């Protein structure tokens, strides 16, 4: 599901709320989550999961086109850990 599909589905389910308001709310929520992570803070949504940053240590990689070795710097990457309720709901497809 893409962001625009999410907005469309929410707007359909919440027909009493204008679609533009739903779009603005979704975009604002995602922007707030991104800025919270960028500040190094953790986000926890009970029953859904938590977002945090994990550190990736510096390493030697390879350029896929040339095969040359490339030194990659350490960096923080977003990480999502699903909550138990979400894992249980997703498990019906397993």
Swiss-Prot record:
One cellular component (GO) term of this entry: chromosome
Q: Name one GO biological process term.
A: DNA recombination
Which keywords does this Swiss-Prot/TrEMBL entry list?
Conjugation, Cytoplasm, DNA recombination, DNA replication, DNA-binding, Transcription, Transcription regulation, Translation regulation
- Report, from the record, the phenotype seen after gene disruption: Increased in vivo levels of ATP-DnaA.
Q: Name the InterPro entries on file.
A: Hist_DNA-bd, Histone-like_DNA-bd_CS, IHF-like_DNA-bd_dom_sf, IHF_beta
Cell membrane found in the keyword field: no
Q: Where in the cell is it found?
A: Cytoplasm
What SUPFAM superfamilies does the entry give?
IHF-like DNA-binding proteins
Provide the transmembrane region boundaries: none
Q: Which family does it belong to?
A: Belongs to the bacterial histone-like protein family.
What biological function has been recorded for the protein in this entry? One of the 2 subunits of integration host factor (IHF), a specific DNA-binding protein that functions in genetic recombination as well as in transcriptional and translational control. IHF in combination with the datA locus promotes ATP hydrolysis of ATP-DnaA, called DDAH (datA-dependent DnaA-ATP hydrolysis). IHF binds oriC as replication initiates, dissociates within minutes and slowly reassociates during the cell cyle; IHF binding to datA is low before initiation, rises after initiation and dissociates during the cell cycle, allowing IHF to coordinate replication initiation. Plays a crucial role in the lysogenic life cycle of bacteriophage lambda, as it is required not only in the recombination reaction, which inserts lambda DNA into the E.coli chromosome, but also for the synthesis of int and cI repressor, two phage proteins necessary for DNA insertion and repression, respectively. The synthesis of int and cI proteins is regulated indirectly by IHF via translational control of the lambda cII protein.
Q: What is this protein called?
A: Integration host factor subunit beta
Which species is the source of this protein? Escherichia coli (strain K12)
Q: What is the lineage of its organism?
A: Bacteria, Pseudomonadati, Pseudomonadota, Gammaproteobacteria, Enterobacterales
- The UniProt gene name for this protein comes to ihfB
